[in-house]
Amino acid sequence: MGYDQLPPGKNPPEDIYVVIEIPQGSAVKYELDKDTGVIFVDRFLFTAMYYPFNYGFVPQTLADDGDPVDVLVISREPVVPGAVMRCRPIGMLEMRDEAGIDTKVIAVPHEKLDPSYSNIKTVDNLPEIVREKIKHFFEHYKELEPGKWVKVENWKGLQDAIEEIKKGIENYKKNKEG
């Protein structure tokens, strides 16, 4: 079964699946080839930085940038690329880059995977230092790449993340139909 056959979650948009592409602590940007289901090395980060948390996407979604909805999963351990995590969205980071609007849904593992995050309901519940690390990473990780840039615009709440996932599911269905 390919990732395109994996539903967007157990009860989306509140209970989602995230296909992990990049493990926490990696300085390598991996990307899943949607046609083959194979994970490729997209590039090594040019900066002396690493992904602060696991990073992936919600299957069967299509964001405004033409890719599946991106998700940064706050967790305690790195997860191998290709693994699927059951998650709960808590908010979103709105950004802009050289290609246009680029939003990142922020999520935590579902309570059945790790109850440590059961008290985190929105990004506002995250420690300030965690939000600052995420913002700092995305503001700087492309800096040394020619022609690339990122501007972090603002944090959005849980409802915005849910709407982004819903829209991604609808876009995917429309695109698949025709």
Curated annotation (Swiss-Prot):
Protein name: Inorganic pyrophosphatase
Coiled coil: none
HAMAP family for this protein: Inorganic_PPase (MF_00209)
Enzyme superclass (EC): hydrolase
Enzyme Commission identifier(s): 3.6.1.1
Residues reported to bind Mg(2+) 1: D65, D70, D102
Record field: catalytic activity: diphosphate + H2O = 2 phosphate + H(+)
Localization (cell): Cytoplasm
Pfam families: Pyrophosphatase
Example GO biological process: phosphate-containing compound metabolic process
InterPro entries in UniProt: Pyrophosphatase, Pyrophosphatase_sf
Chief location bin: cytoplasm
Transmembrane segments annotated in the record for this chain: none
